[in-house]
Amino acid sequence: MLGKILKKEDCAACRFCCSFRRTSLWETPIFTKENIEAIKTNPSLDETVLNVIEKDGYCFAKYDLSGQYKTDDADEEVPCPYLGENGCILSDDEKPWDCKIWPLRVMNKDGEIVVALTPTCPSINRLEFAYVKDFVSVNLKKDITEYAAAHPFLIKEYRSDFPII
């Protein structure tokens, strides 16, 4: 979604968004029912890494990386199970919405849906916040908030270090 302001090569070389420390497990992506079905039809993908959840009439999935850590080091990172040597191996239909909108996050702040910016993305942090905010506000915010309202299980709780767009 941010392909007009972020270079694909920079993101592919970085991979920061595709690995998780224990403190960032809350950010592992959520897969919609449609993502799950698309993954199931692709024989080259392992669907067993997904924990399917049915809650409040919605079906979605997350993967659990907690057992993948090899040390007690808080800074140890574990990659997404769908991260290949050349980047993400998921097609657009298989890729979770969280990944599609990274480094943006849709969050619940005091009952209001807000679009926020992940403060740790090296690529987006090279850009002026005002520029990113204007781009997102004009081009993406409406679609993102509408999608989130229709898929409330994708909304994460607000964190104060995430600047609101």
PLM segments and residue spans:
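Short loop/turn segments that flank or connect secondary-structure elements
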Residues: 1-165
